[in-house]
Amino acid sequence: GEITFFRELDGDPVSHKYITGGPHNFRDGQSQIGNCQIEVYPMKPGPGMFISRYVESKGGGINHIAFNTADIENDTNYFKDLGCDLVFNVSVNGKTTENYIDTRKHGDLMISLRPSADKWENSWRRNNESHPLVSNWNFIGQGICVNDLSAASDYYSSLGFEKISEKKDDQAWSVSRQQFSLGEVSFELIQENEKSIYRNSLSQRGEGVSEIIFEVEDLESELLKFEKKGISALIVSGNKKKASIDTREKGNILITLFEKL
């Protein structure tokens, strides 16, 4: 197989090709949270170096989200036709197994496209989710801090994301929000109106993913579990159906939980 790396985080396009097989010079890992799998890096200089550049410049955080697609080439060309660069390509026997697309213009988040999950991958996911230490949380999506909510809204609309809500003020969280979706994943654009729980993320990284969002069966019981681990809720909604949890110690990412209706 081959890995072709087209861009750094900034600057002019580049092209470096690496032949895969045998020992590799990077490490990653997986963290299973409910039905959401988080890939844990960093990579060192080599085929995934743009991810290390992100860590070097902005610290820990989430820099891309991966989607399975039935036609990776067609969907890649869709984004390229909209002016989004191809950052990184992985192929095996000439067949693409992953493409990274530069969709960072507003929100600093890339999209990774992968082929449809095969029988082995689906079995692997079910095995991960069945582990006794894995919660039954349902992944909803990501909260993304932006500097200009209107511009970010226009950008996500131009990329073909479905607009789920209009812009609205959230006084309890001191932000304005607007929700989009791609497939079954929610992308909540967040603009800080005054000092908020997102200030740390904005100060360290600027725009970018600030939280991952889950639906849970019983919010109160989940908050008690966090309390026993010494982890506090930063904000709980007045109706006790939503809470943001301070899980920023590693990765500087909050967890927001909604109680299932």
Question: Which residue stretches match the model-derived regions?
Answer:
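N-terminal beta-strand motif that seeds the catalytic metal site of vicinal oxygen chelate
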Residues: 60-68, 117-153, 209-212
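C-terminal "cap" of GNAT-fold acetyltransferases
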Residues: 9, 13-27, 171-185
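Short, structured active-site "lid" loops
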Residues: 19-36, 191
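Short glycine/proline-centered loop/turn elements that form peptide/ligand docking sites
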Residues: 150-152, 168-174
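Conserved active-site tyrosine of GNAT-family acetyltransferases
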Residues: 1, 79, 152-157, 226
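Vicinal oxygen chelate
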Residues: 39, 73-135, 178-182, 186-188, ...
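Long, charged/polar, surface-exposed segments that mediate recognition or autoinhibition
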Residues: 46, 50-66, 213, 220
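Short Pro/Gly-enriched beta-strand edge/turn motifs at strand-loop
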Residues: 9-18, 81-84, 158-164, 227
